[in-house]
Design a protein with these regions (language model features):
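Condensing-enzyme catalytic core of the thiolase-fold
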Residues: 1-678, 682-685
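Flexible, low-complexity linker/boundary loops enriched in proline and small hydrophobic residues
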Residues: 199, 217, 230-231, 253-254, ...
């Protein structure tokens, strides 16, 4: 009945500025002005926004203040293009077509477009050309603007300021200026140009008073991910003719692939499950880069040794197939490469066709090894401060040599392809580009329930659009030292990967990592022999309250399970077996122990984590793959059912009901294509020991004089050593505290200052005065520009080293 929809952008400025410097997206001439000929790039911004959404009829009924009406919208992907950072007219025009068809709005009636327009020369020209191509068909020249001229590029929240500006304009009947626009660009055929670009605030066009004011808002993301929203002015008049969403259908799983630990393909994964084996091994030699031998770090982690786990040591990939450079120092990170491999194989298994309207949904979390780059950058100041405290005097060249040895031993200097692969949403777009898919490409992060949320989103896409299929992929290389450092705060890791006497009695978690993908279509669109299993019902429930306990979570499990069973149209007695979350975290296991046996009395309960460990963001896909393979083996006239339970760090519960089909799955016949060349290389996770690399480089001649400078000094403990306190795991007794009841302080701390807050609120204006002059419309302090420039220059200096 009501929904909160919001966005936030507040990433570490060091990573943001480093990234855009590598992408050469910052203006060399320090001019950032969307749609201006002299603009050479963008400025990054930060911020957040939130909107409350209701059905139009409900809002009118309840007497709510309506700010605007969302008539419709659409998503698309560029598919095959030049490069993941380069926009493509094909995908942008397609999203306009889909959006106005979805909104049932005539493009002739569009008054204003709030553009994506970032200020980058190529991006602005491509977007202007896309609008020319689309709107010239309808002989319409809408007014154009970009809020990025005021606020910069808010990255993950880029659409929120644009929507806010468009909604404000619809309400006020005035369109704000795009500031700093002095020399406007024009579209290729001169259809759109200066006349449409507002340099002053103007009244809303009044060419047709009988039609509602209409605006479009565009957002175009890295990787060719496109979105367009159609907004109209608030109205109390209700629509009498509108389409309804298609009826929900069960989702048939028609293609799969997986790589968990040493089980590197679907056949080996199936054998693993059939024989009830596991993939637990000792830590591979290169995985932690020798950190497991650092006593201080291991003591801080409360580990006497690296835990056994389902580690991925290496995997092979065809670089020519995926069109990525095989440069060791500028290669995509393993997280993206592994996801691409399993998603590609799943698409082949399903027999998908290139160029189809297929959506790609990827469940993932940030690759925590990214922090190695922060460590690399921090070494510059850490070494400088240490030398100063020790009284060691080195020449500038010697300091640089010493610093470079330390930095290169941690990580190579960031380069374009590698740094690009840390951007999560590009992960899905790479598959769309490989297969030339035009459907939405979305990454979704909801921790352990990420895959289940992808399945829910797939249901929604099938009901509200005309997509042909959805690829759902997930990856989590959760065996890195960074991941284990983080997750030790939630619960104790199982050092020996040893099982407890009972699954739900376990109080430690096993390390697991890997990736998997599956393809779904509506059940009515597939033949029986194509199907591994069918997702008949999916439901979510939240166990979060003021004091989360296993009882609250158990109640959420029961609620989600009963809803899922009702959606699937079966009862609990029909369930053959239960796939539990079985994480090894205390309160999660306690909740399942309380709820699942009561729900499914006498049914066998197991968890894939006994075979492959806890894959966190990819844990859901492991459960689905296991259940689908088991159900495929049980294919017969009478269906078998499996219930899957999932629990997330946000205390939400997911519950799925899967069923078997009447026939065993048959892999789609491979199309006959011309044999192409291959370039298969092995990707090793981890690398050489950091300490060993430093020692090896310590033998070079340039260090002789540096060593003498140290040997002549009596070295003392540095006054501000790097602290290891923050990585120390909490006591086990504290591990049942959910994320929702904890507060993380990152960067600057927020002080409680009620007096200042009240003063700030009382002095704030409750309305905005609109002036016709740009200088009075929006003020952007020169100090803000200077801050951007200073940060950018600092980042450029750091990455050049």
């Amino acid at each position: 009945d009501i929904m909160l929809a919001g966005a936030v952008s507040g990433s570490d400025p060091m990573f943001v500025n480093m990234g855009f410097s590598i992408f050469q997206a910052y203006p060399e001439n320090n001019i950032h002005a969307p749609f201006d000929k002299n603009s050479q790039g963008l400025f990054a911004g930060e911020g957040a926004g939130m909107m409350v959404l209701k059905r139009h009829s409900d809002a009118v009924r309840d007497g709510d203040k309506i700010h605007a009406i969302i008539k419709g919208g659409a998503l698309s992907n560029d598919g095959k293009g030049e490069f993941v950072l380069s926009p493509n007219t094909k995908g942008q025009v397609l999203v306009y077509e889909r959006a106005y068809a979805d909104a049932d709005v005539d493009p002739r009636d569009v008054d204003y477009i709030e553009c994506h327009a970032t200020g980058t020369p190529k991006g602005d020209k491509v977007e202007l050309g896309s609008m020319e191509t689309f709107f010239s068909r309808y002989n319409n020249k809408p007014l154009l603007g970009s809020v990025k001229s005021n606020l910069g590029h808010l990255l993950t929240a880029a659409g929120m300021p644009g929507m806010t500006k468009a909604i404000w304009a619809l309400n006020e009947g005035k369109i704000p200026a795009t500031i700093n626009l002095n020399d406007p660009i024009v579209s290729k055929q001169d259809y759109l140009g200066a006349e449409q670009m507002l340099t002053d605030t103007v009244d809303w066009p009044s060419s047709n008073l009988n039609k509602p004011k209409t605006a479009g808002v565009s957002v175009f993301g890295f990787g060719g991910s496109n979105a367009h929203l159609v907004l109209q002015a608030p109205s109390q008049k209700l629509e009498t003719d509108f389409s309804t969403a298609k009826a929900r259908e069960p989702l048939a799983i028609i293609g799969m692939d997986a790589h968990f630990g040493r089980a590197d393909n679907l056949a080996s994964v199936q054998q693993l499950f059939n024989q009830n084996e596991n993939t637990f091994t000792e830590l591979p030699k290169l995985r932690w880069r020798g950190i497991e031998n650092n006593t201080k770090v291991m003591n801080a982690l409360a580990l006497n040794k690296a835990p056994k786990g389902s580690y991925v040591e290496s995997f092979d990939i065809d670089f020519l197939r995926f069109k990525v450079p095989p440069n060791e120092q500028d290669c995509l990170i393993p997280q993206q490469l592994m996801m691409m491999k399993v998603a590609d194989n799943a698409a082949k298994d399903a027999g998908l066709k290139e160029g189809s309207n297929v959506a790609v949904l990827v469940a993932m979390g940030i690759e925590l090894e990214l922090h190695q780059y922060r460590g690399r950058v921090n070494l510059s100041t850490q070494i400088e401060e240490s030398l100063l405290q020790q009284g060691v005097k080195l020449t500038q060249e010697q300091r640089q040599t010493l610093t470079n040895i330390a930095k290169d031993s941690v990580a190579f200097a960031a380069q374009l392809n590698q740094y690009t692969s840390f951007i999560g949403n590009i992960m899905a777009s790479r598959i769309s580009a490989l297969w030339d898919f035009s459907g939405p490409a979305i990454t979704l992060s909801a921790e352990e329930n990420s895959v289940y949320r992808c399945a829910e989103l797939a249901e929604n896409l099938f009901q509200t659009s005309d997509i042909d299929a959805v690829i759902i992929a997930a990856v989590d290389l959760a065996g890195s030292v960074e991941n284990i450092t983080l997750r030790q705060h939630y619960g104790k890791v199982n050092i020996d990967a040893s099982p407890a006497s009972s699954l739900l009695d376990e109080n430690t978690w096993r390390v697991g990592e890997g990736a998997a993908a599956f393809v779904v279509k509506p059940q009515s669109k597939v033949e029986e022999q194509q199907v591994y299993a069918t997702i008949n019902g999916i439901s979510f429930a939240s166990g979060t309250d003021q004091h989360v306990t296993s009882n609250a979570t158990a109640s959420a499990i029961k609620k989600a399970a009963n809803n899922a069973l009702a959606i699937a149209g079966v009862n609990a007695e029909s369930i053959t077996c239960v796939e539990a979350h079985g994480s090894g975290f205390l309160h999660e296991n306690a909740a399942e122990q309380q709820a699942l046996p009561a729900l499914y009395s006498g049914k066998p309960i197991s968890s894939v984590k006994s075979n492959v460990g806890h894959l966190f963001n990819a844990s859901g896909v492991a459960s689905i793959v296991k259940a689908a393979l088991m159900l495929d083996a049980k294919s017969n006239a009478k269906p078998s059912y499996v219930a899957i339970n999932g629990l997330g760090r946000d205390e939400s519960c997911a519950h799925l009901i899967l069923s078997s089909s009447q026939q065993r799955h048959q892999t789609a016949a491979a199309p006959i294509v011309k044999k192409r060349p291959q370039l298969i290389k092995t990707i090793n996770l981890g690398g050489n020991s950091i300490t060993d690399l430093i020692i090896q480089k310590g033998q070079i001649a340039e260090l002789t004089d540096i060593k003498k400078a140290f040997s002549s000094q009596t070295l003392v403990e540095v006054s501000h050593p790097i602290t290891l306190k923050n990585i120390q795991p909490k006591a086990v007794a504290q591990h049942n505290v959910p994320l929702s009841n904890t507060t993380a302080v990152i960067g600057a701390q927020v002080k409680n200052n009620q007096q200042g807050l009240v003063k700030g609120v009382s002095s704030a204006k409750t309305s905005t005065d609109v002036s016709t002059k740009t200088s009075k419309e929006i003020y952007q302090a020169s100090a803000t520009h200077q801050a951007f420039l200073t940060t950018r220059q600092t980042a450029q200096q750091q990455i050049s080293q």
